[in-house]
Amino acid sequence: MGEVKETKTNNSKENPEEEVPGVITTTTSAIHNFLKKTKAQDIINWGRKNSLWFMTQPMGCCGVEMIATGCAHYDTDRFGIIPRNSPRHADVMIISGYVTKKYLPALKRLWDQMPAPKWVIAMGDCAISGGPFYESYSTVQNIDEIFPIDVYIPGCPPRPEALIQGFVELQEKIKARKDRGTEY
């Protein structure tokens, strides 16, 4: 009559390392090999890069663009970028808009309350160079002499896409440990 053909099945008791097409398997040995080849600092930086919690200082028109960035259309949560209201829970400070001499001590105090490691993003022409208020008696110029700016996002105001790109650049700096933020 007919011949009975043997069919090969993936029985985990026979060969647990056998690959099944379309199925991703992780074995303990693969995890151990990954950990042996990876430095602990690289794993820590991977976690830091994928969980940036930022505190905003919305001054001027850049604050409106920051609010737009937080809407569902841009979905910054997919990058691990989450806003925080407390400086003690944030590791990124976004300085946006102009900084006045009266506001500077409060901004420094918020910076001091943030735990290390911490990073700073300067968003908008006003934060970077003073913008149209450059020659004003009350505007602080050269904010990068006061705070260690890691990423500059130019524009007046920069679009939400530019802010997201700035976060991606910061993530790459953290991954490569080329950020000039505070010590670890």
From Swiss-Prot:
Residues involved in [4Fe-4S] cluster binding: 61-62, 126, 156
GO molecular function per UniProt: 4 iron, 4 sulfur cluster binding; metal ion binding; Methanosarcina-phenazine hydrogenase activity; NADH dehydrogenase (ubiquinone) activity; quinone binding; reduced coenzyme F420 dehydrogenase activity
Cofactor note text: Binds 1 [4Fe-4S] cluster.
InterPro entries registered for this protein in UniProt: NADH_UbQ_OxRdtase-like_20kDa, NADH_UQ_OxRdtase_20Kd_su
Single Gene Ontology BP annotation: aerobic respiration
Domain of life, per lineage: Archaea
One GO CC term on file: plasma membrane
Keyword Metal-binding attributed: yes
Membrane topology value: Peripheral membrane protein
Catalytic reaction equation(s): methanophenazine + reduced coenzyme F420-(gamma-L-Glu)(n) = dihydromethanophenazine + oxidized coenzyme F420-(gamma-L-Glu)(n) + H(+)
Keyword Oxidoreductase: yes
Sections of the chain in a coiled coil: none
Function recorded in the entry: Component of the F(420)H(2) dehydrogenase (FPO complex) which is part of the energy-conserving F(420)H(2):heterodisulfide oxidoreductase system. The membrane-bound electron transfer system of the complex plays an important role in the metabolism of methylotrophic methanogens when the organisms grow on methanol or methylamines. Catalyzes the oxidation of methanophenazine to dihydromethanophenazine. It shuttles electrons from F(420)H(2), via FAD and iron-sulfur (Fe-S) centers, to methanophenazine (an electron carrier in the membrane).
HAMAP family reported for this sequence: NDH1_NuoB
Full protein name: F(420)H(2) dehydrogenase subunit B
Species per Swiss-Prot/TrEMBL record: Methanosarcina mazei (strain ATCC BAA-159 / DSM 3647 / Goe1 / Go1 / JCM 11833 / OCM 88)
Gene: fpoB
